[in-house]
């Protein structure tokens, strides 16, 4: 069983993948997307779901700090529907509050340059989202 973890932004889509046992998440890549133009990287996601035989997708679900759903959360809900229809696998919306900030702090503490952080931040956020989900299953 492999699970794909996604962190949806307006310009990029961070992608992570679980190991076959469902214990750990590894960053795969960051896909450039154009949310305004309706390009969500579905062609590349189709390749990944086929290559890795994905059973489930965990999509980061950004909520406001008070628990309400804002515009980014609504975009994630719509994207989840598209993913389910396109790939015919269950999509789990996972609370991702502060995941990007936590990934940023982790990269800063590892002394990763600002230029390098910009390239990997969404992939790292996807790892944190997926790992949180996997940990909840295995606890």
From Swiss-Prot:
A molecular function (GO) term: nuclease activity
GO biological process: rRNA 5'-end processing
SMART domains linked: YqgFc
Keywords linked to the UniProt accession: Cytoplasm, Hydrolase, Nuclease, Ribosome biogenesis
A single cellular component GO annotation: cytosol
Primary site of residence: cytoplasm
Domain of life: Bacteria
Localization (cell): Cytoplasm
One Pfam short name: RuvX
Top EC group: hydrolase
EC identifiers of the protein: 3.1.-.-
Family affiliation: Belongs to the YqgF nuclease family.
Protein role: Could be a nuclease involved in processing of the 5'-end of pre-16S rRNA.
NCBIfam families on file: RNAse_H_YqgF (TIGR00250)
Stated name of the protein: Putative pre-16S rRNA nuclease
Lineage: Bacteria, Bacillati, Bacillota, Bacilli, Bacillales
